[in-house]
C-alpha cells in the first residue's frame, strides 16, 4: 500500500543481488485490481497498521483464487501483528516474554494520571507509553508514576497509545542488547545486534559505528548465531513461528536477565538491509547474503509442488 518506507515489506532489500524481477502492485482496498502481469509467485508485502487493516481484509477473498503461489497469504496474521494482539498471543507462554500491551485512549491515560482510574492489573509502573502507529522510538517514554504520566500527556497530541510494563533487560555489564531477527520459512536469521547503555536501543543511536568493541561482539553474534542465540531460544522461536503463522516476518527482541526471549515487536515490514559501510562492518556482508539467500530460496520453494 502507499506509505512511507516502513509501510511495506522491504522487498527491494530482501531481493538484493538476486535474479528475480520484482513487480510491485500497490493496493488500497477500494480500487479494482488491474490486469495482473504474469508472475511466478506473489507475496503480501503490506505491514501492520490501522490503515492497513481494511486493505488486508479486502485481499482475503482475492487471494483464495490467486493463480500463482502466494506467500504471507494469511492476511489475518498480518493484521494481528499489532502490539496489543501480539502480546495477547504469548500471555500464557513460558518461553516468550511479551509484556502485556494495552491500547488506551488519551482520556483513559488522563484518568490514570489523575488517579481517577486504577492501573489495569496487567500493568505495573514504570510504564512504556508510545503513540499508536509510531516507530523508531518516536514519543516513546518510560513513565515512572502518575505524575510523570501527567507531564508526558501535556505534550501528547495523539488519541491513543500502546502501554506496557517496562522490563529491565540490562545484561550483567549494564548494557542493553537488542536483536533484529528475520524469521524466514520458520528459520531465524540475525539481521543486527545493537548494544547500548540506554534501554531504548536503536541501531543508529547505539554508537555501533564508534565502538570497535561493540562491532566485534556483533560480528561474533552473527558468526555463531545458529549455535548461540538461535539454539538457546530454539523452542521460543518455534513458538513464535507457530503463533505468528506467516512465511516471513521479523522481530526485535532481547534476552531477559533470567535468559528468556523478550519480544519487543513483530512485523512483516521491519527494515532489514545491507546498507552499512562495508569497511566499517565487513562481517555484515556475508551475514546479509545468507539472510537474503534464505528469502530468495523461500520464493523459489513456493514454486515447488507440495509433497505429502
Predicted regions and their residues:
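Short glycine-rich anion-binding loops that position phosphate/pyrophosphate groups of nucleotides
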Residues: 47-50, 132-134, 269
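Phosphate-binding site of ATP-dependent enzymes
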Residues: 141-236, 240
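Short, solvent-exposed loop/turn elements at beta->coil junctions and helix N-caps
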Residues: 30, 166-171, 253-254
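Protein kinase-like catalytic core scaffold
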Residues: 127, 189-190, 249, 262-265
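C-terminal active-site "lid" helix and adjoining low-complexity regulatory extension at the edge
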Residues: 242-246, 255-308
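Conserved N-proximal alpha/beta basic substrate-recognition cap immediately N-terminal to
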Residues: 3-110
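Active-site nucleotide/adenylate-binding loops and adjacent lid/helix of ATP-dependent enzymes
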Residues: 39, 75-177, 208, 231, ...
